[in-house]
Amino acid sequence: MNPPKSAPDAQGLSYRDAGVDIDAGDALIDKIKPFAKKTLRDGVLGGIGGFGALFEVPKKYKEPVLVSGTDGVGTKLKLAFHLNKHDTVGQDLVAMSVNDILVQGAEPLFFLDYFACGKLDVDTAATVVKGIAHGCELSGCALIGGETAEMPGMYPDGEYDLAGFAVGAVEKSKIIDGSTIAEGDVVLGLASSGIHSNGFSLVRKIIERANPDLSADFHGRSLADTLMAPTRIYVKPLLALMQKLPVKGMAHITGGGLVENIPRVLREGLTAELDQNAWPLPPLFKWLQEHGGVADAEMHRVFNCGIGMAVIVSAADADAAIADLTAAGEQVWKIGTVRASREGEAQTVVV
């Protein structure tokens, strides 16, 4: 096929001239293959690079139900760009999806990522994917594929967006849906590692108002590192707990905080009453509240306030659950109880 005729001095165009560097994409794949290889587990068929990623459901499941989740990192990325810190957002990406599917009792099996940018910086992208692979290792799932989209003009230089997709499996008879939660059950709170990945639009507004020195020491590390601490992944300790005692319900404390996420697992007619004095409010949340003048109710509705996962068990199992999770390295508190709802009352109240 002959190219169309053009002006005598015009040169032929390439994809690189249009802003897409295929060689950079190939270099990225070579850089990230070792990271993905470290996440391999039983069930993975083939490696990265195929048109589709293949995974065989483990034979230990008699009636496997697949559970899927997808999420991003939100405007925490804007802070990552400002700080030029890209090594933690990959774990955030994995955590947001695997913690979500864990809530229904699912074991995460595999993960795929989507990385979109205007101009591909191979080193930055590789750093992000290394974090994704680390998150997959922490949750026992395989990084089996993904997409890197270089789209000139779509994103400002130095910026990118992320999306993640997790698929897990749970035995049909062991799906956790909150249907067995009853009056008198105990709500346990597992400590968060920080803000996690929700509420960063408000965080950034507070930073804009307070104009702090982000490199200054904040309780033993820089304020920047404290703000960017990666989302905690609760998969392995909670999967182990489920093997030992009945977990009636779980809530991943994301956007909406405690007051909007716990109701998602409660039957109509039940309320979780939480005691805000039952666990310590971490210094970072105190700092945000003070410098932003944020009301208590708004704090509980936007941030996790130190609790990244809520677990509901019977009162008889509460102490054993706390002991098991503590032995696994989690900080756990009894933060509330389940009772009958009062007329016109929300399904989660903080007192």
UniProtKB/Swiss-Prot annotation:
The organism's place on the tree of life at top rank: Bacteria
Gene3D superfamilies, sorted: PurM-like C-terminal domain, PurM-like, N-terminal domain
> One MF term from GO for this chain?
phosphoribosylamine-glycine ligase activity
**Pathway(s) of this molecule:** Purine metabolism; IMP biosynthesis via de novo pathway; 5-amino-1-(5-phospho-D-ribosyl)imidazole from N(2)-formyl-N(1)-(5-phospho-D-ribosyl)glycinamide: step 2/2
Chief location category: cytoplasm
- Note whether Ligase occurs among the keywords: yes
SUPFAM superfamilies for the chain = PurM C-terminal domain-like (SSF56042), PurM N-terminal domain-like (SSF55326)
Any one GO BP annotation for this protein: 'de novo' IMP biosynthetic process
The similarity annotation says: Belongs to the AIR synthase family.
Name by which UniProt lists this protein: Phosphoribosylformylglycinamidine cyclo-ligase
Q: Which gene encodes it?
A: purM
